[in-house]
Regions:
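Loop/helix-junction capping segments adjacent to catalytic residues or to phosphate/diphosphate-binding pockets
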Residues: 11, 28-29, 97, 219
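Rossmann-fold dinucleotide-binding core
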Residues: 47-128, 163, 230, 245-248, ...
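Single conserved hydrophobic/aromatic residue that forms the stacking wall/gate
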Residues: 1-12
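Substrate-binding/catalytic subdomain of NAD(P)-dependent oxidoreductase enzymes
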Residues: 90, 116-254
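Generic detector of well-ordered alpha-helical packing
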Residues: 2, 23, 52, 77-80, ...
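Rossmann-fold NAD(P) dinucleotide-binding segment
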Residues: 13-66, 70-71
Length: 254
């Protein structure tokens, strides 16, 4: 009945939590350290899950106790969680079946999620396809010199994708987080995987990160939002010199 935990301090305070969801950055060293701390204080009746979007369960559970492994799974909620119905679940062969059944029932009937059961592979289903598509679209758009707002209009509603497109979605997710996501894919995928052709962050992304531009949560990214006379004003980035400019809504005749 209450939303629990934005930090480990809250976990210590809520040792009676029925379900603890880990949602830290996509770095396995940080996750392993957090799991070790959670295992010391959690209720033996609790379920622990990760909101990872890319890291396989076999990697997440490498340093876990057997008891925690039996209570651990992946619950990948899609962003924004309050609107997106999709929920990917990956479970271990040793996961407590009664707890897993209860978790599925809660997610479907109380949270209103549509559950997709996934194999334990990098990126599961959604991000294995989606992140690859984003990377290909980004590389193609930048290579062809497409303005970001034009690229997003093309890689958006016409393809049945949210209007954020690729560059807007990068800003929404966080450019720094996307770099961690790509690093995770690079570590786990085989060298002959087609994803490896586009898994490296684009040089423009590296330049943005060097300037501290992480997307919506920072001073800007491929778009920059400012407040003008109390109203939000969005500018697009010129990818050739990283300056920002005003733009009109793109209306494609498709």
């Amino acid at each position: 009945d209450r939303t629990v935990s934005r930090g480990l301090g809250d976990v210590y305070k809520r040792q009676d939590a029925d379900w603890v969801i880990e949602a830290v950055v996509e770095r396995i060293d940080i996750k392993h350290k957090l799991y070790s701390q959670i295992d010391k204080v959690r209720s033996p009746d609790s379920i622990i899950s990760s909101n990872t979007s890319t890291i396989p369960l076999s990697i997440l559970t490498q340093e876990m106790s057997d008891t925690m492994k039996a209570d651990f799974c992946i619950t990948h909620f899609f962003n924004p969680v309050r609107f997106m119905r999709l929920l990917e679940i990956v479970e271990t062969p040793t996961m407590n079946k009664d707890k897993m059944s209860g978790l599925r029932d809660f997610c479907q009937n109380e949270l209103g999620k549509g559950i997709v059961n996934c194999n334990d592979t990098p990126g599961f289903i959604g991000n294995r396809i989606g992140v690859y598509a984003m990377q290909v679209a980004m590389y193609e758009a930048l290579e062809r010199g497409l303005p970001v707002e034009i690229a997003d209009a093309l890689f958006g509603r016409p393809l049945g994708i949210p209007k954020t497109g690729v560059f807007g979605l990068y800003d929404l997710i966080g450019i720094d987080l996307m770099k961690d996501v790509l690093a995770s894919f690079k570590k786990e995928l085989q060298e002959n995987d087609p994803f490896m052709d586009v898994v490296k962050p684009h040089p423009l992304v590296e330049k943005l990160l060097e300037k501290g531009f992480n997307g919506n949560k920072g001073p800007g990214g491929f778009y920059q939002t400012t407040i003008v006379d109390g109203d939000e004003h969005v500018k697009a980035m010129n990818t050739s010199d990283m300056s920002y400019y005003d733009f009109d809504k793109v209306d494609l005749e498709i």
